[in-house]
Amino acid sequence: GDHKEAGKLLALFNDEDRLATGFVIERAQLCTAIRRFRDYTPAEGDRVKPGGVILLYVEPRNFGLQRNQDKHILHLKYEWKLYDDRSTELQVPAWEQASLEEREDRLSVNGPVTEFYQSFKLPLPANLAMGHYRVKVTVTDAHSGKTDRVHVPIYVTAVEKR
């Protein structure tokens, strides 16, 4: 019985820690490959080509779950914005016109989960000038209403002339 009690106490402490810490984006990483939770190949650097596609690994933590009979519902919303080195927002129609399925996760799981990740393939505009940019990734926990955002730096290289 002591092990069961210890397990319950540990779960309670973990829940309290999650609530105290609050909803956050634990990781946001530029990648070359993403296989599963915390199993990805980080990009060697931040260099990308105009018109290329960036692959992002995003790991939110301390998200809320809504209980529905014996299921738990995870509901997260995503938004991406591109900023240049002067912090001016640039329009990226492909990101703004992303489908609801690409901008939202609503998952039904058997038990409470604390680990979750999402990957995004974001096409860059072909007309980007060479220079430093930031991708602002915003994740909102629809259950708690809490939002966190991170900036992922990228450097757009020159287009090779042929």
Regions found by a protein language model. Give the residues of each.
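Intrinsically disordered, low-complexity terminal regions enriched in Ser/Thr/Pro/Gly
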Residues: G1-R162
